[in-house]
UniProtKB/Swiss-Prot annotation:
It comes from the Bacteria. GO terms for biological process: division septum assembly; FtsZ-dependent cytokinesis. One of its GO terms (cellular component) is cytoplasm. The gene is zapB. This is Cell division protein ZapB. The lineage of its organism: Bacteria, Pseudomonadati, Pseudomonadota, Gammaproteobacteria, Alteromonadales. InterPro entries: Cell_div_ZapB (IPR009252).
Length: 74
């Protein structure tokens, strides 16, 4: 009876150890995914800033052109 209990306990402990190992691998994968997503997010933010600045420049140029057109029409 005691031997059976010890074998059951050993089996449960081994299952727990295996589960912990799998969870640790999953955590590492998730950390890597998080790093990739963080880098991608930073790239997208930089691209957004660049595009916003470019948009503002074009708006300024267009406003200047509209102003010149209005001056010539006056």
């Amino acid at each position: 009876m005691t031997l059976d209990l010890l074998e059951q306990l050993e089996s449960k402990i081994q299952n727990t150890v295996d589960t912990i190992a799998l969870l640790q691998m999953e955590v590492e994968e998730l950390k890597e995914d998080k790093q990739v997503l963080t880098e991608k997010g930073e790239q997208l933010q930089a691209e957004n800033i660049r595009l916003t600045e470019e948009h503002q420049k074009w708006q300024s140029r267009l406003s200047a052109l509209v102003g010149k057109i209005e001056e010539t029409e006056s």
